[in-house]
Amino acid sequence: MDKFIDLNADTGEASTPDWAASEAAIMDYISSANIACGGHAGDMETMVDTARRAQESGVSIGAHPSYPDRKNFGRLELTLGEDIDPKILSESLYEQIARLMDAAKGEVKYVKPHGALYNQAVKAKPLAALIGDVILRVDSSLSWLGGPSSEMTQAAQERGLSFIGEGFIDRQYSEDGHLVARALDGAVIRDQEARLAQALSLAKTKHVTSRAGQKISIEAGSLCVHGDSAGAVETARVTRDALIEAGFDIRAFA
């Protein structure tokens, strides 16, 4: 049986030369690039440059929109209707994705929300619905990359959108199958061997070991390594090599 999986990384976010070099290098090992659209990072110049690098590397392009919150890198949780008006958020997300589509000359294949927007939409039905409506409004052929067995999954199904579940190589999971908050010690996995072990477990068994040591199911068609984490390029390289050795074809889902 043909086995394949996607490797994705967040890109277009760099704020230092070293980080930018890491983003460029990681293109050699991933199959999909989530490109920041200006909400938490990036501008038209970085979008054009990152999209070009992805295209030259044969990497699928995805939009990585966020709350319009550059100050907090899109990682501050906001309450819909209190901290941000739903209409304002909807317009911001639409504009972010549309700008990337212009920068990439229409070659955007999917959408992956960023940071707090992603984490909250896993559990918040109204927020997931808003994101789904924005994707439909932009282009109903766009796929949606997000948390498996989540409100995002349900929102995509209700709107007839293609949905791909994602697993994280470098993040701990809680017992409910969602990510441990970054503020907690150990939430970001920094050890390369531990990252590789989690990647292989996600790909081969569709399971991970939670923070409390419980085995939980994660149905992931794409594995993410955060481009801003230390050692990201090496993680992508060894993960790709190990997956190929295990019989997987590294292939974009869209």
Residue ranges of predicted features:
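Active-site rim beta-loop-alpha module in soluble metabolic enzymes
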Residues: 149-207
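Flexible, glycine/charged-enriched surface loops at secondary-structure junctions
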Residues: 105-109, 207-217, 249-254
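Glycine-rich tight-turn/loop motif centered on a GG-T
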Residues: 19, 33-40, 73-90, 121-125, ...
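C-terminal domain-boundary segment and adjacent tail
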Residues: 142, 236-254
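A short alpha/beta connector and helix-capping loop motif
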Residues: 15-47
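Glycine/small-residue-rich loop that forms an oxyanion/phosphate-binding "nest" at active or ligand-binding sites
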Residues: 70-110
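Conserved, mostly hydrophobic/aromatic
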Residues: 10, 64, 111, 225
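Acidic (Asp/Glu)-rich catalytic clusters
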Residues: 24-28, 49-62, 102-105
